[in-house]
Amino acid sequence: MPLQLSLPTSPSPELLAARAPERARHEIKLRRTTVESVEQLTPHMLRIRLQGADLAGFSSLGFDDHVKLLFPDSNGELQLPPPGSEGLPPAMREAMRDYTPHSYDAQAQTLAIDFAVHEAGPATAWALQAAAGHALGIAGPRGSFIVPTAFDGHLLIGDDAALPAITRRLRELPAGTQAVVVVEVNDAADEQKLDSAADLQVHWVHRQGQPAGDAQRLLAALRQIDAPAGDYYNWVALESTAAKALRAALIAEHGAHPKWTKAAAYWKRGSSGVHEVIEE
């Protein structure tokens, strides 16, 4: 049966307040790190673990937080501006990219970041040649958007670039919660093992070499999912146009409440360095 989220037409003010996300601000600090290890998760996903004393005090409270990655120059030198200076060099700013922290180990002072490697760009180029000892700069996160786990369930929709955030969210969800995940990857080789204490359903959508960013494949998959029950939080992260289409369909066709439906553009066809929240 088509996906129909069983949400109240007009949630009470009390319910909306109980489900309201929190925001946290963080001090912006430029951190110098080096690569500790590189792990090939799938043909198109690398996990790079960073280390360094500058990671002390790192904080990321939201599952879809993002940090800015600052890349070395063509000589492999990471030229971070000294504390107190105003801004970054233009070339470094243009090459910055947003990535979700996968996991942070405060005791070991290590930070893992997953890289979906597809089209050429500064992040993909750096990740593909990364090796132990290579330098990388980290800035942020500037803030965290903390979504309660107290919903009856969570619907998480995305593509390869969204997998790190989806993985984080699944780690956070408690037993007794429903989690429905719909992820588009190229083929079965790019599927990852997803774990959660929640009652988890995972639906993989394969594009089989077709260009990424087509909303129709995920829209078709949603129509095949059995209806969940209870109040659901909906989270979408995709190519910009596709994310807008998915959010609109969830609200207009599947009964999702706008306040419980967050969509983000993790990339945009024809553009570089895009990361934006979609409000409508």
Predicted segments — roles?
Residues 2-280:
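Extended, composition-driven regions rather than compact fold-specific motifs
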